[in-house]
């Protein structure tokens, strides 16, 4: 028996039926809203990457707020002419007002030499303030002003087939322009001075980006509203950056994430009564951002911590192997590095720990990992021995370290102790080509194991003689 009685069963069945109606797109209005918002998400995600890389994110916010006075003025104009409220006229007014706001930003930044953040703040506050005043006047004008507030917060449920065609046209326009001008927009985003030096119209390209932002913003007024449209422009692009650094992959990934956000938000809004679609879409985009922030394979926190942990493990293992070679070298017990390599003589692990002042529990972990890799052998009496493979690896690490030390001491006039510390930081990221450059820079054929410029222990202890 299900807890809660018959009412709980009825509620559960109703919820299940509502979910399946959405999944199978049985309702015409659901199909319209879902298709329109998905097209909007694709366009916003694609365009948002260029805004993010161009550092023009806030200009989308300024333009979206600048559309409000255009909506109010278009409504007042239609009322003064004795006409009914027309969505096409309202969107046209929003487009003109948004474009004007974008041009004012460009004028203040280039002609008036005002900082971009100040120009954006001026346009956002002035235009939105004017829009609020005009919206109040429109609501008191006696005309049919009902529904104008939906342009602020969004109301996807009111979308029609004409709105879907509009979203589709906007998506096609965004993909067409960004595809045809992909090379120019990439250079504009990454190296503006290079684009300017090659004679490209940087200001015109900026204006084109602003124009696309106006188009996407105006189209998105119905779905998410002018306040939240900026989140749809920025959040999918920001999420995509956690997964890849390749712009060719980032663009489609951002578009797909935008579409997924719109799909999830629209479905949630359809299932939960009185849940605003705009807020639901933005929350879905934010949820994807959190997932990307944590698990993104390029910049996600989880993978960055994993890479840092792996690098730290590699550093510790290198330090232990290098310490063993230096310990054997100081006692003239290092095996011959020519011909067939043999295992090294055993090294007292306790003596090594005492020399380097390492914590015992950490050294035990290092030894276990190196033993699993067949680089060292730990005997029952606490002695550590390098295998032939481990000896070869350890000598490579010592050579890298000493090449760096010599380079820093000869070319940077660094003291031996300072060169040792700096080499500890740099050696773990060396590539074979870096080693070749170091050898060439020293103008001599460096032996396989260069001499130690500052041995930790130049003579064996008295009790070992």
Which ranges hold each PLM region?
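Transmembrane helix-bundle core of multi-pass membrane transporters
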Residues: 124-178
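Short amphipathic alpha-helical interface segments
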Residues: 309-358
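Membrane-interfacial segments at transmembrane helix termini in multi-pass membrane proteins
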Residues: 281-326, 432-458
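Membrane-interfacial amphipathic/re-entrant helices at transmembrane-helix boundaries
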Residues: 1-41
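Structural signature of hydrophobic alpha-helical transmembrane segments
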Residues: 29-41, 87-99, 168, 218-231, ...
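Structured cytosolic domains appended to multi-pass membrane proteins
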Residues: 337-465
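Short loop segments and helix-boundary regions at transmembrane helix junctions
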Residues: 49-64, 68-142, 240-254, 268-277
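Helix-loop-helix "hairpin" substructures at the membrane interface of multi-pass membrane proteins
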Residues: 160-231
């Amino acid at each position: 028996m299900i807890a809660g009685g018959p009412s709980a069963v009825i509620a559960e069945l109703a919820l299940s039926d509502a979910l399946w109606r959405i999944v199978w797109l049985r309702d015409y209005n659901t199909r319209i809203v879902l298709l329109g918002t998905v097209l909007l998400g694709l366009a916003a995600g694609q365009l948002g990457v260029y805004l993010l890389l161009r550092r023009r994110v806030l200009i989308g916010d300024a333009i979206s707020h600048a559309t409000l006075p255009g909506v109010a003025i278009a409504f007042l104009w239609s009322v003064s002419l004795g006409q009914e409220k027309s969505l096409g006229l309202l969107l046209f007014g929003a487009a003109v007002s948004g474009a004007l706001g974008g041009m004012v930003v460009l004028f203040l930044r280039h002609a008036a030499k005002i900082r971009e953040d100040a120009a954006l703040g001026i346009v956002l506050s002035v235009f939105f303030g004017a829009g609020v005043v005009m919206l109040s006047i429109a609501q008191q004008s006696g005309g049919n002003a009902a529904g104008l507030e939906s342009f602020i917060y969004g109301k996807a449920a009111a979308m029609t087939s004409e709105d879907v065609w509009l979203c589709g046209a906007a998506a096609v326009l965004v993909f067409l322009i960004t595809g045809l001008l992909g090379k120019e927009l990439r250079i504009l985003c990454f190296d503006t001075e290079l684009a300017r030096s090659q004679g490209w119209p940087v200001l015109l390209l900026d204006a084109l980006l602003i124009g696309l932002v106006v188009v996407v913003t105006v189209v998105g007024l119905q779905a998410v509203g002018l306040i939240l449209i900026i989140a749809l422009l920025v959040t999918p692009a920001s999420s995509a950056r956690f997964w890849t650094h390749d712009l060719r992959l980032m663009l489609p990934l951002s578009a797909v994430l935008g579409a997924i956000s719109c799909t999830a938000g629209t479905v949630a809004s359809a299932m939960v009564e009185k849940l605003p679609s705009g807020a639901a879409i933005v929350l879905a985009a934010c949820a994807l951002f959190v997932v990307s922030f944590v698990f993104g394979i390029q910049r996600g926190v989880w993978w960055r911590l994993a890479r840092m942990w792996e690098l730290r493990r590699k550093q510790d293992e290198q330090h232990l192997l290098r310490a063993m070679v230096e310990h054997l070298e100081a006692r003239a017990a290092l095996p011959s590095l020519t011909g067939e390599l043999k295992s090294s003589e055993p090294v007292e692990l306790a003596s090594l720990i005492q020399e380097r002042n390492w914590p015992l529990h950490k050294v035990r972990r290092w030894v276990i990992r190196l033993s699993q890799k067949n680089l060292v052998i730990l005997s029952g009496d606490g002695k550590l021995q390098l295998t032939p493979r481990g000896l070869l690896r350890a000598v490579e690490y010592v050579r890298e370290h000493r090449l760096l030390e010599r380079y820093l001491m000869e070319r940077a006039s660094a003291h031996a102790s300072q060169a040792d510390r700096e080499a500890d930081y740099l050696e773990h990221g060396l590539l074979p080509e870096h080693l070749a450059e170091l050898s060439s820079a020293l103008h001599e054929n460096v032996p396989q194991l260069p001499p130690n410029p500052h041995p930790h222990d130049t003579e064996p202890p008295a009790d070992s003689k």
